């Protein structure tokens, strides 16, 4: 039941924030700013320093308010570490069937990466709950629309190059949610500690989702 509730939360939010920072303190501040702006689904990538510790801290401090996941999960060892640290979903740039199986075993969401129609179908049939279309900026909204046409039953989450200028186009093209990184959590903004800016951007992305879904 929890897994389905978590999937519904991802789909309702429409935004999965990909968050990176140089310290766990910074990352917690980023997460708080995103939450204040209305984005409550967040992915901590395993490219950040001490990713497991960061996941544990964010889960401890904000786990009851956000849906926390781990990104750049390339193997089962990383997957297990992420799940034990509190991740409720795992995101990958590619498809590793064993990682998907681990998610299913523990009742967590699997969001593997794929790009071609064959890769997307393979990921979904392996048990993906959402397929991350990556790197989506290579083809843009037009490519996502072409994918979605024959595969309307597969939840697609474009990631890579999603910003405020094209977010609406991706949603209209069939995206169930958007994976948003640098255009939402800008590295320079984090370095300056301008978390108000991140809150503002989060609110703008959520406004785009609401507008597209109500028109």
Predicted regions and their residues:
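A generic hydrophobic-segment detector
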Residues: 118-173
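Conserved N-terminal beta1-alpha1 strand-loop-helix module at the mouth
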Residues: 1-86, 105, 153, 164-165, ...
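Histidine/lysine/aspartate-rich catalytic loop segments that bind and position anionic ligands
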Residues: 89, 93-138
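Glycine-rich beta-to-alpha transition loops that act as phosphate-gripper elements at the mouths
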Residues: 20-22, 48, 68-76, 92-96, ...
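Glycine-rich phosphate-binding active-site loops on the catalytic face of alpha/beta enzymes
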Residues: 89-99, 133-141, 173-196
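Conserved functional loop/turn residues at catalytic and ligand-binding sites
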Residues: 38, 62, 86, 94, ...
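Short catalytic-loop micro-motif centered on adjacent basic/acidic residues
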Residues: 41-44, 90, 132-133, 157
């Amino acid at each position: 039941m929890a897994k389905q509730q978590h999937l519904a939360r991802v789909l309702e939010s429409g935004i999965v924030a990909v968050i990176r920072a140089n310290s766990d303190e910074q990352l917690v501040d980023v997460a708080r700013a995103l939450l204040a702006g209305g984005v409550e689904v967040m992915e901590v990538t395993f490219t950040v320093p001490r990713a497991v510790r960061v996941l544990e801290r964010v889960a401890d401090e904000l786990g009851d308010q956000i849906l926390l996941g781990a990104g750049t999960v390339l193997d089962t060892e990383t997957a297990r570490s992420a799940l034990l640290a509190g991740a409720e979903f795992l995101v990958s740039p590619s498809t590793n069937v064993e990682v998907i199986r681990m998610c299913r075993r523990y009742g967590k969401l699997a969001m593997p990466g794929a790009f071609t129609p064959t890769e997307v179908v393979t990921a979904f049939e392996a048990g993906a709950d959402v397929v991350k279309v990556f790197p989506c900026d290579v083809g843009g909204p037009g490519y996502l629309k072409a994918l979605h046409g024959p595969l309307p039953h597969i939840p697609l989450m474009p990631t890579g190059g999603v910003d405020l200028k094209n977010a609406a186009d991706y949603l209209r093209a069939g995206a169930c949610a958007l994976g948003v990184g640098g255009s939402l959590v800008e590295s320079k903004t984090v370095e300056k500690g301008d978390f108000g800016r991140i809150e503002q951007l989060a609110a703008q992305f959520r406004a785009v989702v609401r507008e597209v879904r109500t028109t």
